[in-house]
Amino acid sequence: MRTQKHSLHRRPLPNAAVQQFKLETWHKYSLYALVAALFASGLVWLLARYFLRVTGEYGESIHPLEHWAMQAHGALIIPLSFLAGGLLFQHMRRAHRALRNRYSGWSMLATLLWLALTGYALYYFASESLRPYWSAAHWIVGLALPLLLWLHIRLGRRLSA
């Protein structure tokens, strides 16, 4: 009997593989900690930028927290990118094939890509006239990220129960 090598339809995952899209504990808590730290550093930057301006003899100047918060925020992106990339095979691909939590998963991926794109734009090619727009596009979505992550987790747990 001849087996078909290629098909337009994917074979469903075996039951053991379906359950393997749950994250390991260290991965899950590392992601939670990094998202919380990114949220906190972004929030500190927002507060320093818009509410803690220092007025000196030459006018308004930046608050020292603004610079440090931005540096911490940029540094935290590196490990988050590494851990988010680790989700691709084990978590995202298998959950997608198992038809689990697709809408919130794709929303999470689109949000992370948007934040990466706008963050890159702010760092590399935003002109001074467009910087406020790129910045708002970044921090408005960034403030919504913890809520979207919570919703994604909540829906995933509800579906698995």
Q: For each of these PLM feature ranges, what is it?
A:
Residues 1-161:
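Membrane-embedded alpha-helical bundles that constitute the cytochrome b-like, heme-associated redox core
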